[in-house]
Amino acid sequence: MSMENSPLKYQLLVAMPQMADPDFEHSVTYIVEHSSEGAMGLTLNRPVQISLGDILSDMDIEIEVPPSERHRVVAGGPVQQEAGFVLHSAATRWHASIPLSDGLILTTSRDILEAIAIGEGPEQSLICLGYAGWDAGQLEQELVDNAWLSTPASRELVLETPFEQTWHAAAARIGVDMSLIATQAGHC
C-alpha cells in the first residue's frame, strides 16, 4: 500500500473496548503522520494534573493574561512526554506550524505558548505532552488485530468535546455505540 495518501493520516483512532494498554484504554488518538516508516499520533482525551499556567511557569514564560479553560492539557502519548505539541485552529503565524485537516494546525514552537501567555494566542488549544508512536507496520497490524476503529477527525471533536465524552463521540461519528461492543469475542 502506498503511504503517500495514507488513509490513516488525519484520522482518529478509537481504542476498542478490549484495549488493555493503560496508555490507550478508552483513548482517542489523532494521527498526525503515517508513512511506510511508521506513524505518529496525539492522544486527545488523557487530561493531566498539570495546568498550562504550570507549564508556562516551568518554561519561564511570564503570564500577562491567565490562560482560559479553552487551553486544555493532555498526555499526548507515552513517547517523549517532555515534548509539547499544540493543536489549535488559529492562523499559522508561529515558527513551527503545520496545517493538518479540518482547520486544525499543529505547532511545536515556544512562540505559541508565549502568545497565549500575553493573550494573543489561539482562542482555544489542546496542549499535548508527548506523543504516540508506531514503528513501520505496527499500527497496520494493530488495526488487523481489531485494536482500533478509524474515524474521520473534526475540529470540534478535537478541540471542544469534553474529555469524558470523546471516546463515545468519536465512535458515534461512524455509527458505533461503544457500550454495545463486547470486550471479548466468544468462540463456539
UniProtKB/Swiss-Prot annotation:
Gene3D superfamilies: VC0467-like. Disulfide bonds: none annotated. InterPro entries: AlgH-like. GO terms for cellular component: cytosol. PANTHER family: UNCHARACTERIZED PROTEIN YQGE (PTHR30327), UPF0301 PROTEIN YQGE (PTHR30327:SF1). Belongs to the UPF0301 (AlgH) family. HAMAP family: UPF0301. NCBIfam families: PRK00228.1-1 (NF001266). This is UPF0301 protein ABO_0112. The lineage of its organism: Bacteria, Pseudomonadati, Pseudomonadota, Gammaproteobacteria, Oceanospirillales.
